[in-house]
């Protein structure tokens, strides 16, 4: 009898485990970095697509969602699905495709965040993906070799976004060295250069569209950093756009008096990272030249941060 009762309770135990897991995922997403959220979004879309595909397969009906989320090369199809220029970069269908893309994103994203704030990571991911999509569309509608397949071609995956991060790092920190398995230490500039050469060669392969998109992402990564050096953040508008969407769908808070301007999580983390970097610079200066070498402003910053 006790065994029978346990058997009946199994679905409830399973449901409890799922609910606890879902709660942990939500908390991790809410409290995680921009890199964590990008990875979660890609994984979430992948799982939803693959699970939904199972039901369509069992019903014996075509699976329509890839066509509605992947980026078409044909202009007329794109005009009816403009959102695909954004959705395609979060869309994967093959397990190995998403595995390698997310491993590459996790690895390069961590290095990127060592040099830049989270808002710039979001900007370069999204705009690198858009630039890659535009290269793909332009290539398929410009070169005669694609004339017969342009109407049926679709692009999906985060590869263009990831390679944008790689080339951005190669321009900003060309001598940053990575330890590659079976190879040893390799500088970032050589990793980016090798990748770009392989993408150019790969245009004549079966994945011509993907390689065109990779080149577009690589191009954006270079342009973004070069403009950033001139004091121009080409990705600022995309973060403002997402912040506006977040405020639009966020429930209205209760009205209360506040003398400080509220900031979102990304902005808060950006400010904290800047403060931390500034303090480290001041401490390094003290260790090298002593406390008396600090300027009046640096002493005030150190005093203020010590009180917090």
Task: Describe the function of each predicted region.
Residues 2-274, 278, 282:
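A detector for small-residue-rich transmembrane helices and their helix-helix packing motifs
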Residues 273-308:
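Terminal membrane-proximal soluble interaction domains of membrane-associated proteins
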